[in-house]
Amino acid sequence: MFGIFVLSANVGAQEVTSKEIFSIPEPTWIFNSGMSKGKNHDRQDLGFILNENTELRMRQTNAHFKNKLKLRLLGNDKKNEKSIEVGSNWVSIRADEPLVPFIDTPYGEGSAQIEYEVVTSKEMKALPVYKYHGNETMFFSMWDTEDAEYALIQGVDFQLLVPKLDKELVRNLKDFPSIDALIEYHHGIFALFNGIAGFDGSAPENQNGANRYFLKADDSGAGAAYYGGDWTANSEPTTDMWLKELSWATLHEIAHGYQAGFDGQDMYTGEVSNNLFGVQYQYEKYGKKADDIGWLFNLGKKEEVENKLYDKLSRDGDTYHDVDVREQLILLTMFKQKAGNDSFTKIYQEYRKMANQSDFKDWEYTLPNLMNRIYSENSKQDFSAALKKRGLYLDEFQAEKNRVAGYPAVASLADIVSENELVRARQLIDPNYLINSNFELVTNEEIASLGLAGDLTIEILPSDLSNFEGLTVELKDGATIIASQPVQQKMTFKNIPNGVYHLEFSGEQMKYYLPSENYVYVKETQNHASLSLIKADISKLADEDLIFYGFNDQWSGSLRTNLNSREATLTLNMPKPHYLFKDELYVKVTIKSQDGKIRYEKSIYGDIPERFTDDHLLLEIGDSIEIYHAEARNRLKGPENLIDRGQNTNHWLVTEHGLKHLGLNNNPEKDLMIKIEKLGNSLVKAEGIKPMAWERSMAKKQLWTAIQSLSPKDTEHYMSQYYVLFK
């Protein structure tokens, strides 16, 4: 990583100059995971500044190098910058103002060779370049002597193109004693971010890439700053953002490149999850002082931020989807902190490993499910209740795995302690965590010493099961049974310690019924929970998810079927699915009854804002579903045999075995058998669930129900194959 100050010679006029352009290995294992990480940022300067209205001619001369190069003229305003592809034939480029020529670093093994000439009688100014451990005096002497419009600062992880108007800012850095210290500051950011993302060399997919970020100014940039495909920039003519130590924008924009393919999958994280990197950086570096100088609590306005979040979540019943991006960040920070930073890193590493498999399907790995599985299994705590409390959709099978493993459930402090006891609870809990909030996650054991307890009344709502004879319900904290009672229409558990508990029903009849809720919350008050016991007539294995993606392949929404509940859920979680489809229909969902009457219709336009939607719609066997997607070829996703990518409009018939595509004519019963075998084989191998009583296991009930829906011959076959699960 060490270099010296580079004193580039002036480029003479009408001289053909040769230069080798080195290549770097393409880190496909990173890009395959949906992480851009400065993918097209790395570039090589030519050592000079091209004068305004001056022609630069270039060609590539290595016959063994087959790809074209990208030549760019860069400055501090993209509207004035130029670019052109360079092949074996001479090409020309010029600009209306002095700009710096760069060649984008190609990916591959072989180097390229360029020849270029500047068509002018004037000499070009040399580009001052400072590398780590260089000579600052010589660097500024050259910058002053040349009166260069730009200079370049290079580190091992990044390059920073600095305009002349910032020369004195660099000469007299306010937050750093030297340019080396500035480079070390940025290197520290990249080093931590690489560690968070799991680039530790522990496996081939955990190697870091060799490409560098490119940092600059852009007076025509969007917003205050932005991360883009070719660079990341301060949206002003100055690079002052990159020269400050306490620059949240620096952390925020760099971290955008570390967002992976799981981001935004079934929950909005676009301007949120990158900030998890910035939060960890600030709290690791500054400790609790980050409450006052960091972005998480709005630069010292913690009480105001916390009060607003409490009002939304605890008083108004809002979910993750309803609160603003800072509040979403607090919630994600609390999840991450409780699971441990290593659990967050494990999400990255496991996802990269999966994403580099040939049969990988990104839509199958939603962020809520990844968090629930990896956070729970890595920390040996059950995150299911806490995630569902925030309105996130979870795979029921993973939630059961957590419970069977005996993991204690975690909950936000504000969800298990009343407002008038929060101060005392915080005094107990806060010293144990670096980042504190009313919504920090705790186990029941952590608050037990408060001595708080309340009564819990559980009401079984009128449903499919009305005779409760022989049924028992247990209130459990992890593997520990706190209390149990015979099931009645209304039951009260007295003097239960504050906390979150899971319910476990048993009894012969429960082989065929499913509770609508699995978790209950207790505060030091009178607590009430309502749930239904629902007959499992149609297995969850028959359900399908149809996913709508939008601009930049972002998850925009989904239609999920729940055939046992006779409903479909339409979820929309992108305000504008695709802004380029201005005033154009982008997605349309229609549900029709068997006689052709429209039950539901929703039109979604590309650039018209939509509020977060989570609509539960009536869906009966025999109904039809129609989805129009303007980019169905690659942005309507689901099982391969359920999506006709050659048609923008897809039609399905709802059957008891699942969806039948009316164009592709898949066999829903055969599709269901594949799912039966996948679940059945996994349960046979599951040490915790395999010996578990059928009546206590949701997964076994779903498997049994699916098997019973088949033909007598197939039912007999699968009951014999998975007999060990039901004996």
Model regions: which residues?
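Amphipathic, non-membrane alpha-helical rod segments
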Residues: L503, L679, L683-L725
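Compositionally biased low-complexity segments at domain edges in trafficked proteins
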Residues: P128-Q159, H528-S565, E656-M698
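Bacterial N-terminal signal peptides
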Residues: M1-V6
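Beta-strand-rich domain onsets/edges
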Residues: F439-D455
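Sec-dependent signal peptide cleavage junction
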Residues: L7-Q14
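Catalytic cores of extracellular degradative/oxidative enzymes
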Residues: S141, E149-G340, F344-K361, M371
